[in-house]
């Protein structure tokens, strides 16, 4: 039959000696075997074991955390929309004990799943099974908070597993999303004519999460239903100019701005459209408000590309024109106004965009970013 030649694509990860694979460091390599004209290859993932104490210390050398978060009294606080945690295990079971301030929902993604499993998270402290009886070998489990910040906040107390491993590092691509109800998946699972509810809302079906998932990107979403850039309309005590400065709505410490996103996507102006209909004089003020916020975002993120979107629930020319003028006034080649061809949609609950439209926008945004 002849001699079988076995080689590794990266000997800093895996070496092959006398036909035996030897792990060198964490990472991924391709092992290729060839005999005569026949060949085969397989991917090999090398991960280090982790202890329960390491994982439950919530350090990102052992787990991945998505979105602004903080640790308080030994608990990992997940307030933000679509906050997520990725855990690595070596097969078997994984559970989490967490506390929720209100009825909410989670999506659980195992390995390369993109749809995930939706799980109801009632108010209070409970233990939840995230994965069970997985075959031996490395598995990545992501739990994502599918409910927006103003409806529920979570505290993670502890994870339990048969065998923890260090999770593989996140993507180098980082995207920050700033928005309103569109960005949180408000009513996205509901039908036109229905009222919005926690049950028919899901931020994992909104375009920011869809785009980040399509790009396998690290992400952070700062969004709040009903919010304006600086005006107070549906929300009487909060605007994005203030919310963006803080870790979260419940943790008002000044945010460190250490995420350093490659790309920032701002989607504001929809609530100002409604506000303007009741406060006509605001037309003269909006440009200055949006420009001031855009300038602050640039100040805190000097190297990021900034994409300003508008029109997913219809267009008011005064608002759209104000956003475009603010972008032009910045005179910054890394600030881009509305690069997508957006077809507005109001076919879901309370006249908000449906999942089908959100998914399409997310994919279009991902395609634009890739190009």
Each language-model region and where it sits:
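N-terminal secretory targeting modules
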Residues: 47-178, 182-200
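Alpha-helical cap/lid subdomain in secreted, periplasmic
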Residues: 244-371
């Amino acid at each position: 039959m002849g001699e079988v030649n076995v080689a590794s694509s990266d000997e800093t990860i895996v070496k092959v000696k006398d036909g035996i694979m030897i792990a060198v460091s964490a990472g991924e390599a391709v092992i290729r075997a060839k005999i005569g004209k026949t060949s085969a290859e397989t991917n090999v993932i090398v991960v280090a074991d982790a202890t329960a104490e390491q994982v439950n210390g919530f350090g990102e050398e052992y787990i991945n955390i998505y979105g602004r978060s903080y640790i308080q009294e030994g608990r990992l606080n997940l307030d933000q929309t679509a906050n997520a945690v990725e855990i690595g295990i070596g097969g078997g079971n994984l559970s989490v004990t967490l506390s929720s301030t209100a009825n909410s929902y989670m999506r659980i993604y195992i390995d390369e799943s993109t749809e995930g499993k939706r799980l109801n998270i009632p108010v209070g402290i409970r233990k939840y099974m995230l994965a069970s009886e997985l075959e031996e070998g490395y598995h990545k489990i992501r739990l994502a908070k599918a409910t927006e910040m103003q409806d529920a906040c979570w505290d993670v107390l502890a994870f339990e597993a048969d065998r923890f491993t260090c999770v593989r590092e996140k993507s180098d691509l980082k995207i920050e999303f700033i928005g309103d109800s569109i960005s949180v998946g408000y009513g996205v699972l509901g039908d036109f004519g229905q009222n919005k509810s926690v049950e028919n809302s899901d931020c994992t079906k909104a375009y920011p999460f869809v785009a980040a998932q399509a790009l396998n990107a690290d992400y952070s979403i700062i969004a709040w239903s009903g919010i304006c850039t600086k005006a107070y309309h549906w929300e009487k005590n909060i605007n994005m100019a203030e919310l963006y400065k803080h870790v979260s709505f419940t943790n008002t410490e000044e945010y460190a701005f250490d995420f350093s996103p490659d790309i920032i996507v701002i989607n504001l102006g929809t609530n100002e459209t409604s506000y303007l209909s009741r406060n006509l004089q605001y037309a003269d003020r909006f440009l200055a408000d949006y420009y001031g916020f855009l300038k602050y975002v640039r100040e805190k993120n000097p190297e990021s590309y900034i994409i300003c979107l508008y029109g997913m629930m219809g267009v008011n020319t005064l608002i759209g024109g104000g956003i475009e003028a603010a972008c032009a006034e910045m005179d910054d080649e890394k600030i881009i106004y509305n690069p997508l061809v957006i077809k507005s949609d109001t076919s879901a609950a309370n006249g908000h965009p449906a999942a089908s439209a959100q998914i399409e926008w997310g994919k279009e945004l991902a395609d634009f970013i890739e190009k």
